[in-house]
From Swiss-Prot:
GO terms for biological process: 'de novo' pyrimidine nucleobase biosynthetic process; 'de novo' UMP biosynthetic process. Substrate binds at residues 9, 34, 62-71, 117, 179, 188, 208-209. The keyword Lyase applies. This is Orotidine 5'-phosphate decarboxylase. The keyword Acyltransferase does not apply. It catalyses: orotidine 5'-phosphate + H(+) = UMP + CO2. Its EC number is 4.1.1.23.
Length: 231
């Protein structure tokens, strides 16, 4: 089963209204609630605590940590103490940073960020990387994460099938950049529909603005679930 993760990159009051509406309609479906810098800077760790207290959903604190290993380790420890279910670290931070994150995760799951979906092949040129394409660079980063203990990776839907075929260990594949209407790309360059992402092997499908900017978030989630064959 592929799960929908709702990216709540909106003010806190709006986020709570959306979650309440979704809960009223999808009480038994295991949604994941993702909060990022916007809400975290507004509410701090209380955002995680309140969501966990008021709703039966897993909470994903997406801060994309990237710093020296000791700093990331301390941050991960504090994030875990909030009751967070998932958090992210940038795999570009390297093996030692990843190991320190994993060592301090407690019962939380660590997700390694590969290449953001706002990047395309031009990013490889910008980095002056020896990799010929973004797909193989993503595979390299994913292996760095999985070999050092992450529970899953965040990658584009264009790479998820390639990763699943070329990495022997089981891992959670989290795919952002999902659009029900692919023409609504916003600042994403590599996008798929929910059905396409599931077919290619995504375990968690992240949908943000199509839900949070909709007048009817419930309809958007319901439509995505139908496209995925989950209801």
């Amino acid at each position: 089963m592929a799960r929908i993760c709702v990216a709540l990159d909106v003010p806190w009051e709006r986020a709570i209204k959306i979650v309440k509406d979704l809960y009223d309609f999808f009480e038994t479906y295991p949604l994941i609630l993702k909060i990022g810098h916007k809400i975290y800077l507004e509410k701090g760790g209380d955002a995680v605590k309140e969501l966990k207290e008021d709703f039966p959903y897993e909470v994903f604190l997406d801060l994309k940590l990237h710093d020296i290993p000791s700093v990331v380790g301390l941050a991960v420890e504090k994030i875990s103490e909030l009751g967070t279910d998932y958090t992210t670290v940038h795999l570009l931070g390297g093996p030692e940073m990843v190991k320190e994150a994993v060592k301090n995760k407690g019962s939380m799951k660590i997700l390694g960020v590969t290449i953001l979906t706002s990047h395309d092949e031009n990013y490889i040129k910008f980095l002056k990387s020896n990799f010929e394409d973004i797909k193989n660079f993503t595979l390299y980063l994913a292996r760095v994460g999985i070999e050092n203990g992450v529970d899953g990776v965040v990658c584009s839907g264009e790479e998820v099938e390639f990763l699943k075929k070329n990495i022997e260990k089981d891992f959670i594949a989290v795919v952002p950049g999902i659009r029900i209407k692919k023409e609504k790309r916003h600042d994403q360059k590599r996008v798929l529909t929910p059905a396409e992402a599931k077919k290619r092997g995504a375990d968690v499908i992240v949908i943000g603005r199509e839900i949070t900017e909709s007048k009817n978030p419930v309809y958007v989630v319901e439509r995505a679930l139908k496209m995925m064959g989950e209801i």
